[in-house]
Amino acid sequence: ITLLAAAFTGPVKALDGNWLKDACNAPYGTQDNGVCDGYITGIHEMSTTRLCLPADVTNIQLMDVVTRYLNDHPERLNRKSRILVQDAIKQAYSCKK
């Protein structure tokens, strides 16, 4: 049990836009880039926001949308990363009225 507890000690990273931007801008194939992919996929799949994504949209395309949004909006990076993911995808794939 002590060993298990020790595995989870250490500094806690804030899950804000700065953290996500760093992860998403990491080189493709790195652990950080994989964390970005998994995080965006998880937030997207849990989202209840009405979106009109193309049926063939890929995780890589969603990562590109979110990464571009984060890079283009540095003034928002202090916000929670889950909100930024939702905002980026909603901006790119909102349904036409």
Task: Pin down the residues of each PLM region.
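Residue-level marker of positions within ordered structural domains that often coincide
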Residues: 1, 29, 44, 71, ...
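Bacterial N-terminal signal peptides
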Residues: 1-7
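Sec/Tat signal peptide C-region and signal peptidase I cleavage site
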Residues: 8-14
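Short N-proximal segments of mature Sec-exported proteins
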Residues: 15-68, 88
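Short, charged low-complexity intrinsically disordered segments located at boundaries
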Residues: 52-54, 67-73, 93-97
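Short, compact, well-ordered microdomains
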Residues: 74-97
